[in-house]
Curated annotation (Swiss-Prot):
It catalyses: Ni(II)-pyridinium-3,5-bisthiocarboxylate mononucleotide = pyridinium-3,5-bisthiocarboxylate mononucleotide + Ni(2+). HAMAP family: LarC. Belongs to the LarC family. NCBIfam families: nickel pincer cofactor biosynthesis protein LarC. Transmembrane segments: none annotated. It is an enzyme of class 4 (lyase). It comes from the Bacteria. Signal peptide: none annotated. This is Pyridinium-3,5-bisthiocarboxylic acid mononucleotide nickel insertion protein. GO terms for molecular function: lyase activity; nickel cation binding. Gene3D superfamilies: mk0293 like domain, Transcriptional regulatory protein pf0864 domain like. It comes from Desulfitobacterium hafniense (strain DSM 10664 / DCB-2). Its EC number is 4.99.1.12. Keywords: Lyase, Nickel.
Length: 402
């Protein structure tokens, strides 16, 4: 699996991340062509190679051709929605802007639809966010890790006056994320950078086991006492080499609630909201409570930094008045996604490995369902053929199967 590690020793901002992606191999001309799909003609984009404390990096500049344009979230949603961008880029970009809107709304004590974006609604923020999403997509990065984030200290000038560092919206977005400050004055982590990194990253800590393929440095505008750079390392997760054992270990939180008085029709919508918000798993079990009442035990597994968001959804969308939270340790087999061709069409197959052998071969259900609807053939028949084709593919590539 292609992964990236963001080393945020000098914070993170949208332009620094975009610069790091370009420095790590994202084709700048291709990026410009992709961004042209936004149909915004109010800016010019250019790159510059700079030195920060003797380290070369790429600085991305977005030059606005018009005055500072303030936009509402609905304006940004309309721009992205009608764009010619790929669906996955649209979806992730909208998710990031929605995260920003929610954070701003909470800070200002208003509804997300009433938020009037200032810096976030400017064209440079739109280009930074959509450009970063394009970069991860173009480089084939499937998983993102990050270090604890250096946020800086002091005050920063904003539309509402002087704000403490980290800015309130930044701190809200970084809830549950490890942050720190050293003797560096100024805003190092911006709301845009915080929104992007928390939308992509579920694990904040030291370097994962990764086979380094390329490294990029994105440069900030300020000159600091430390290199004002964001370092991006891209490569294959070493744990997920098909020929390696590499059982991965991780940590998460489990949230539990007992519910005996909720309309069961509401669970479908609840599951959808939890997964969209970043839940790792959601499931229910039948239980029996006091007074012999039939009920369900609703369980949600979530990354640490998503705790507040999950808690809010559970209290808003269920009838519970309390919940339990437990830290858990997870062990996961490395896996890879293969695409196989069948008489019905192409489909993805997830293959898990242990001790150098393929131990689980699972066709992706959504692909199987799509082919069943397309051809009218039985779903189970399509599932089995895809599974057999996958085994043949694995044999042909010399990976043993249990």
């Amino acid at each position: 699996m292609k992964a990236a590690y963001l080393d945020c020793f000098s914070g993170i901002s949208g332009d620094m991340l975009l610069g790091a992606l370009v420095d790590a191999g994202l084709d700048f001309n291709l990026l410009q062509r992709d961004l042209a799909g936004l149909d915004l003609d109010e800016y010019e984009l250019y790159e510059q190679k700079v030195l920060k404390q003797g380290i070369r990096g790429t600085q991305i500049h977005v030059h606005a051709l018009e005055g500072h344009v303030h936009r509402h979230l609905s304006d940004i949603q309309a721009i992205i929605g009608r764009s010619a961008l790929p669906p996955q880029v649209k979806e992730k970009s909208l998710e990031i802007f929605t995260r920003l809107g929610k954070a701003e709304a909470k800070i200002h004590g208003t509804d997300i639809e009433q938020i009037h974006f200032h810096e976030v609604g400017a064209v440079d923020a739109i280009v930074d966010i959509v450009g970063a999403v394009i970069g991860f997509w173009r480089l084939g990065i499937e998983k993102v890790f990050a270090s604890p984030i250096h946020v800086g200290k002091g005050f920063v000038k904003a539309a509402h006056g002087l704000l403490p560092v980290p800015a309130p919206a930044t701190l809200e977005l970084l809830t549950g994320v490890p942050i720190y400050a050293q003797d560096v004055e100024g805003e190092l982590a911006t709301p845009t950078g915080a929104a992007i990194v928390t939308a992509y990253c579920r694990e904040f800590g030291p370097f994962p086991k990764i086979r380094v393929e390329r490294v990029g440095y994105g440069a900030g505008v300020k000159d600091l006492t430390i290199p004002n750079l964001l370092r991006l390392t891209v490569g294959e997760l070493a744990d997920e080499d098909k020929g390696q054992e590499g059982i991965r270990e991780g940590e998460a939180l489990t949230l539990e609630v007992n519910i005996d008085d909720m309309n069961p029709e509401c669970y479908d919508y609840l599951f959808e909201k939890l997964f969209q918000a970043g839940a790792m798993d959601v499931y229910i079990q039948t239980i029996q409570m006091k007074k012999n009442r039939p009920a369900v035990l609703l369980t949600v597994q979530t990354p640490y930094h998503k705790l507040e968001e999950m808690r809010k959804i559970l209290f808003q969308e269920t009838t519970t008045i309390g919940l339990r939270v437990y830290p858990i340790k997870k062990y996961m087999l490395p896996y890879e996604l293969f695409t196989v061709e069948t008489n019905y069409g192409s489909a993805k197959v997830k293959v898990a490995f242990m001790e150098g052998r393929a131990c689980t071969v699972s066709p992706e259900y959504e692909d199987c369902r799509r082919l069943a609807r397309l051809t009218g053939e039985p779903l189970k028949q399509i599932y089995e053929e895809i599974k057999e084709k996958a085994k043949i593919l694995l044999y042909s590539t010399k990976y043993p199967i249990d």
